[in-house]
């Protein structure tokens, strides 16, 4: 009982599971509904661009909110925004879709930043290589079942059903968080620097080579997942296969998260550099193979699942370089800058994809993602051997 009621790796993993269930239930529904409302893959990309810009700008306000209202209330705000996301999506209007996607982006940022701060307060640096894969492994069920369950409800019971289930998971998250009554580590809170201008935080982040390296690795990882959860569903619908297959593909990629603890143990023996580089190279190769077999949907799906293996390895290990490198006294500021990889990995590729899709089909998306993975492998070569 103590393991689920006192701050530690299991408690933080359970919080992430409930958050993941709320988000994963809508994971495939969001791009499918956007495609149904807009009718073109390029228009879907443009919607993601606009939401990404707004979400990125909003995320820089989170340290100010944490300082003004404290971390606990900002976490609650993030969960409430997930509930708002579900309610707005249920309207099945373009305006509701756009605002829902923005609420999801800001809510996810609030939850991600505050949970990362709690993890750094309570988990020792040498234990991160075990606790982070454990968190991902715990969430495997959510990300495996959620996308398929959500799209099945969406197609069989109609709009509103998947959204209702997502909102219920968000309510459970709020109740569990209230039960835990988490507090900030007083020693760390006392050492935290005052909130500076966001531009000063960015300059401070960029001035630290290890933080730049950690951000790049996380960015490339998120580029793959952003592609995987957005464009393959559109591709499968274009091929006449349907939304259920898209849900199966998303769930199949996420079930691989069950292996995350194994990758954590592997990194404990070999270090981070080799498995991270291998994951990126393998993911890039799978994207290129998907491009070659573009007119064979089953082959494309299998290749993208193969690439998801590499992305799961990066999920298990990719956050560890940042968590080990960041200084305790500037965690809120640096965490906010670091997690911009999530918004930028959706925003920047979406801008590029919007241009490419004017001239090419979805093969251009797969090729671009593969090149990003190869580039990430080159950057990961600079990871210190002892990290």
Name each model feature, range by range.
Residues 58-70, 259-272, 357-358:
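Helix-to-loop junctions at the C-terminal end of transmembrane segments
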